[in-house]
């Protein structure tokens, strides 16, 4: 059963222009929440720059890709951030989006394996229809040919509602491959439409979650696509 959870914000993938230093993030699940430890290559806590009003943007998915959480941990100490999340006895992967000041950082999958010894990954089946109804809203995905290393255009046609600005954009999209290793976080080409562009480095099946805000609430529309 699909589960989608979110908080109201949006995030981009960030790549610092700095060339010095690396930052690593680790995660553990404890007492009903995720603890995230952030440390640079000198063993120090890097200063994080606000990105879209938050210091940290966190995507958590179950490894079978049936659960999706969009969260924003709070800083609780110099190195530590924490957020409550209702994870079950399953295996999960986290992707942490931050912008350390003066340091390089690359988003990597963080396995959260202390919940379950089993590590069951998704066996995705390509959607036959790209029309999805969630919370009474109908959204159709019109996507250009899915060719690896080529620019892909995704147009989301919202049939029976008008999306609201979602911190400067009309939505955002998270894309993860079925091995839960590749991560894309995409936002519209302009503030006035729901057209997104991206590129895939590897062929295969991917799950896509599109988030749109209607009347103050965010709805999540899941799709499975295949890149050749």
Model-derived segments and their meaning:
Residues 1-228:
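Intrinsically disordered, low-complexity terminal tails/loops enriched in metal-binding residues
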